[in-house]
């Protein structure tokens, strides 16, 4: 296989799909196109639309990441009725090599190669170590996390479905919110609060408790909270951010990411420069006897919208080099 192969990259989120080409391990940014998932019934149609705009897809490999679980080369999107298989991806791309990974795995494969300008520091660290374990946490259409291990010339990024673990409960208010979510969905998962629609749920819950169950879209809640024009939006953001910090702290104690914690996803990026004001760092470090340990973990927001595509390119390049 030539060292500078041409590859097809696909990043399928809960709302949009991005398609691009890579030369070797490098993303060709001019090749990136975005498609709305609701306008297509499957990836094959997306790739046909891409080829119609960019010309025939002629590649030696393809790597697709999805917002959903992947097992034995088969993946189903959590918030979209699409199922993908590596043999089908190879067929659609007309490529001899195809890989299907989780979207957080894609972020993890690319995180070590991001330039400093792609990162916004949220929480400083006194004990960060280059090359150590990293943790990537996504808040967007859904929630998930992935731990990143650098093992010499190999990078291991195990998949997880962290967003479907139970919501943490610390206070009576947390318990009431948990029951509110449970009454709607039957199971109070982290993703039911830590996501765009989750923020809407927190706002709705506050209104329900106040006898005024008005609902707003997440973007409007964030706008009102960050401009200080709505007391309820501010309170919703404080609750959301506190739970976000708590969950990130829990994951950090489980994985000990001395190489840093990296926040990704549309909601995380939109809130990145406001997290400090809503108490994220305090919630992250609120771990009782282990509060001091938390100062070892730096936290950055990844502000590169194409980080997952870059990770796909890196992952596929390693696969094709073996």
Residue ranges and their predicted role:
Residues 1-53, 58, 176-322:
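ATP-binding/phosphotransfer module of carbohydrate and carboxylate kinases, centering on a glycine-rich
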Residues 11, 63-67, 101, 134-142, ...:
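Short beta-strand segments
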Residues 17, 69-71, 142-146, 201, ...:
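Short, acidic Gly/Pro/Ser/Thr-rich loop/turn segments
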Residues 23-24, 77-80, 114-116, 150-153, ...:
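Short, glycine/charged-enriched secondary-structure capping and boundary segments
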Residues 35-37, 79-80, 99-106, 125-128, ...:
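Active-site nucleophile and cofactor-binding loops and adjacent substrate-binding regions
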Residues 97-129, 219-231, 235-241, 246:
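ATP-dependent carbohydrate kinase catalytic cores
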């Amino acid at each position: 296989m030539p060292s500078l192969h041409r590859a097809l990259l696909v990043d399928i989120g809960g709302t949009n799909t991005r398609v691009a080409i890579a030369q070797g391990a490098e993303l060709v940014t001019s090749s990136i196109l975005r498609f709305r998932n609701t306008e297509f019934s499957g990836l094959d149609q997306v790739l046909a639309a891409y080829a119609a705009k960019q010309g025939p897809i002629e590649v030696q490999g393809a790597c697709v990441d999805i917002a959903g679980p992947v097992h034995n080369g088969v993946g189903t999107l959590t918030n979209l009725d699409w199922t993908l298989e590596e043999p089908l991806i190879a067929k659609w791309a007309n490529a001899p090599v195809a890989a299907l990974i989780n979207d957080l795995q894609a972020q993890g494969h690319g995180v070590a190669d991001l330039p400093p300008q792609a990162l916004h520091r949220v929480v400083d660290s006194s004990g960060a170590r280059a090359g150590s374990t990293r943790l990537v946490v996504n808040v967007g259409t859904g929630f998930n996390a992935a731990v990143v291990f650098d093992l010499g010339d190999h990078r291991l990024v195990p998949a997880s479905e962290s967003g479907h673990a139970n919501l943490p409960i610390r206070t009576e208010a947390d318990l009431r919110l948990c029951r509110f979510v449970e009454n709607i969905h039957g199971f109070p998962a982290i993703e039911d609060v830590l996501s765009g629609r989750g923020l809407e749920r927190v706002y709705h819950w506050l209104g329900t408790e106040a006898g005024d169950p008005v609902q707003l879209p997440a973007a409007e809640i964030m706008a009102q909270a960050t401009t200080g024009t709505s007391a309820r939006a501010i309170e919703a953001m404080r609750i959301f951010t506190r739970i976000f910090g708590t969950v990130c702290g829990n994951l950090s104690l489980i994985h000990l990411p001395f190489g840093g914690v990296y926040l990704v996803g549309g909601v995380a990026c939109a809130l990145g420069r406001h997290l400090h004001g809503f108490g994220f760092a305090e919630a992250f470090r609120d771990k009782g006897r282990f509060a001091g340990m938390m100062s070892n973990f730096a936290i950055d927001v990844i502000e590169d919208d194409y980080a997952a595509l870059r990770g796909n390119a890196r992952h596929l390049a390693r696969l094709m080099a073996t």
